[in-house]
Regions:
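A short, hydrophobic/aromatic-rich structural module that often spans a beta strand
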Residues: 170, 215-216
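Short intrinsically disordered terminal tails
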Residues: 1, 216-217
Length: 217
């Protein structure tokens, strides 16, 4: 899918966020490198537009994990048939599309010599590096950035803040994540959707499946 179509879809989804400051949030996203940055330096979607693609993939994965309740007009998170949490579609959009807002102004490029296997000639090729212009953490930075423009619910705040799960966490941080999941199970749902997208939907240069990040709803 062309980057232009991904941008259109992203902005269509963000237009469903009806909160004071949503226009300023969109202005920040447009002025930043959110639409052009990679999702990583060398793992999933380490390509131009990877961050945008990944964010939409997480949105699709999160909606796919949840069940829509027509009566309450909410998404329900079920475990073994039991509803453990629920949320609005607006919140799903916020959690998924803004979970990696921290990766804006985060990457740069450098050059390295790479041998052309066909010609045997060494050529200079660009590659992505971390150049964090706002060193404020990861999930916590995403929550702080989003919160500058729109008011986040506690559920949204916890989910975005802890979306990296237990990766690289010490004991006290892991305990905080445990308590957060019990308080707001949607934390675990967003963690799972993020992993599903990065590990199962995405390769280094694009999606594994053509249908990933297709229009939903």
């Amino acid at each position: 899918m062309e980057n232009k179509k991904l941008i259109e879809r992203c902005e269509t989804e963000l237009a469903k966020v009806d909160r004071p400051g949503a226009d300023k949030l969109l202005a920040y996203i447009r002025k930043s490198d959110f639409y052009t940055a990679p999702a990583s330096t060398r793992f999933h979607l380490s390509c131009p537009g990877g961050l945008l693609q990944h964010s939409l993939n997480v949105l699709d994965a999160l909606r796919g994990l949840l069940d829509w309740n027509e009566g309450t007009q909410e998404w329900e998170y079920r475990v073994a048939g039991h509803v453990v949490d629920s949320t609005s579609d607006e919140s799903v959009i916020i959690m998924a599309l803004l979970h990696d807002l921290c990766k804006t102004h985060f990457y740069g490029t450098s050059m390295r010599n790479v041998k052309n296997e066909e010609t045997g000639v060494w050529e200079k090729k660009p590659y992505y590096v971390v150049d964090d212009k706002m060193p404020l953490g990861h999930g916590d930075k995403s929550a702080l950035l989003a919160g500058k423009y729109i008011e986040l619910s506690c559920q949204e705040l916890y989910a975005i803040w802890h979306h990296m799960g237990y990766s690289g966490q010490d004991y006290s941080a892991a305990q905080a994540i445990d308590h957060s999941i019990l308080k707001y199970p949607m934390v675990l749902a967003l963690q799972t959707a993020d992993m599903m997208a990065s590990k199962l939907l995405e390769d280094n240069e694009g999606n594994r499946f053509d249908s990933a990040a297709a229009l939903v709803g």
